[in-house]
Amino acid sequence: MSSEKILHEDNGSSSGSLRSDDSDSNPDSASDSLNSLYKTNDNTCAENCIEETKCEVNKKRGTCCSPVVQCVWGVLLILLSIGSFIFTPLDFMLLEKLNMRPGMPPYEWWSDPPDEVKLRTYVFNVTNHERFLLGLDQKLNVEEIGPIVYLEKLLHSNVRFNENSTMTYTAKRFPIYLPDLNNIDLNATIIVPNVGVLGIFSYLHNANYFVKTVLRSLVSMYNPEPFVQVSIYDYLWNFTDPVLEMSRSLVPGLVPVSNTGMLARVYADFTDEMTVKIGPQWGHKEFFQIDRFRGQPQIPGFDPDVCPDRIFGSTEGVMYAQRLTKQDVLQYWRKTVCKLMPLYFDSELTMFNVPLYRYNLSENAFDRVTNGTDCYDTVPSLHPGLSDTSKCYFDFPMVASFPHFYTGGIPKDKFVTGLKPDRYKHNSFVILEPYTGTPFEAVARMQSNLLVHDLTGFQEKFANVSNSVIPLFWAEYHQEGLPSKIRKTVYFSIVILPPLSIIISTTMLLIGIYLLTKLIYSNNLENDSLKSILIFKSKNNIANKNKMLAFEKETFLKTS
């Protein structure tokens, strides 16, 4: 009985254990086990991925930091640093500028010049014309009125690049009136010389008898006066006379224009085809110098066999040559003056923290040349300080000078009174950055005068004005600074870039030397370690061999 009870209990416990096993095998417990398995697999996979990523990083790091790569980088950095010391980034920029590639900043700035040039015009009012014609005053007296301010707009178009490393384009200049900057009433009247009549008489003073007879008839018919009253606007833009208009209708070949307005004549034909030098083959000194003007190398209107002056080597004033020195002479071409104007180094100065050079127009620019090659003289000869400009104005008797006859060989009261020459107000100069040839400020001041020849063959009132030079007006072309983007670019290129390039080049050199030195030191250290290991192993091998021989010897002796 006791055995049966025990057997029953054992069966119960067995069944209980079986039930508990059944409960463990239910679906919930199975899913838990599967999730735990998934989690374990995920963790293992993540750990494996991390390990693989670390391995790849270590491999890349090992590749990047390998001795061969370090050696290549070291040599490359040293070569780059030496090259940057020899050929600096500034040299590269100046060389690239020579090509004038469309889309690059130098070309874009030139193709659309900034509106920075102001034209200030001053006219002369005659105050004693009646007394002068009556013989009460020996000389005319003039007073200056102005300025009348315009913006001179410059347009570049029709650009084409030639095979001989030159660039041809069309340059057009025209003025735009600026009412906000003007205090002069253009409707105000002034007394001025009758430029059309006096100019035609002076132009034809050596004409034949028939031509002079026609002119006398016109004078008798219209009875013009040597001095007239006109508005300032008409004097500048619409100045004519019935005698001039009739003369042009009768003999248009002798009288090419009927409107003698001062600015009207200056800007009547100011669309010019220019050809300039570009490209590395010309070098920095000849960059953007004029090679042809309207297809010709000489100044327009002059005979190349008589006048040795050539227009090539000059500049229109927008861009100058690069790498200028204090010994360089800048040739400035302005059709208004009809001659090349030389500028010489004057002083060093700083504007906007940029070191600059100032070049002044020679005070002898209008003097006579004594070697027989004076292209700007007339017959009879002009006074020093005057330059013939008639070749650019249909042979009309016009001469150029400094404003108020400043400097030159003309005393200020030689022809008229009332002039007040002042070096500060009447000289011309350009201030530019010498490496890039960028003009920061430029002022060109010129005076136009009427040259009156001997008029004794006409009425007495005209004869009184004979053999004189009458100031008509003078103009100032002033480039007032630069746009901020150009100024900042020049500042960075000249002031910031050179020391910055030295720092970068020096840093590259030091890093290259460091990499090579480190590599050499590491190789020497590895060689020493290898030698030590080989020596240690060889010593161990010898000791082991000695021990083996000793053991074999001892065994042999015992056996014996």
Residue ranges and their predicted role:
Residues 1-16:
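PEST-like, low-complexity acidic/proline-rich intrinsically disordered segments
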Residues 550, 554-560:
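Intracellular C-terminal tails of type I single-pass membrane proteins
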